Amino acid sequence: MSKSHADYIISTVESDHVGTRLTASWRRSMMKHGLDPSRTPAPKRFSDMEIQERRARLEGFMDLATPQLDHLFQMVGNTGCSVLMTDRDGVILDQRSKDADSDTFQDWGLWAGFDWSEKSEGTNGIGTCIAEARSLIIHRDEHFMSRNTVMSCMDAPIFGPDGELIAALDVSSCRADQTEAYTRLISGVVAQTAKQIETEAFRAAFPKARIITGPEERPEGAVLLAVDQDDLIVGATRAARRAFGLGLGGKIDPRPASDILGRDSTSSALERAERAALKRAIARAGGNMSAAARELGIGRATLYRRMKRLGIGENGEN
């Protein structure tokens, strides 16, 4: 079976067919990185010292992400899934799995310190998510390496407050009977968790700024702007950068919020955007204020204060 899978990968890559994003990843794996789909050695593992150095670079971020990772694992851990977080290079820094599944995931290299970059493992959830900077599913025989076709991986990139890719969030399943519908469901939860981590990291990066949610939602994440006391935009999430043409990464040169949100009264434009975001979250949570606050990445008390300031009642209405 492994030979059949490897032969299929090779014939697909060598064909002239343009193909899909998946076949493009297979082609990168073989032609750019020089990988062999029939290769059997396990993924590369970094030394304990190197792992600690990589964790230290993201120490504050990992502390902030821990509650979200714990919550995600509570949701999927009993279904034969592990929860992993990697750095931007695809090296696993943190993992969670049930004791009964731990040996399996360790044998597969889905454990702290292993390198799952696309250049190391070819097409896989973690590496391809990072290479393409998008949420995706790599299901069993979609993997480049034949030995990785036993797993299904659901991944989402995490972008830092500067708009640059900082990490990847992964849920991998060892269940051979996992359905496509359940895989899609988990993928949605992974993407939402990644957005929540991004939101919390962004708010933590601009503690003295007013955080404004844009009037429109985007699939790639929360549209958040950090506005200082002079109504200057000093920060923006990746999604906000796309929405307002602010450049995808790097430091933002402060600019008037009115230049971005319109000149019809900056304060009223900001309030309309913030009010719309709060009402969306409350409606999506069915009036559950705790759930709405979690989605917004703020505390329940903060949510109530903002509702009062913006004239939003307990039922989410003006």
Regions found by a protein language model. Give the residues of each.
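Dynamic helix-loop-helix/coil hinge segments at AAA+ ATPase domain boundaries and subdomain interfaces
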Residues: 264-270
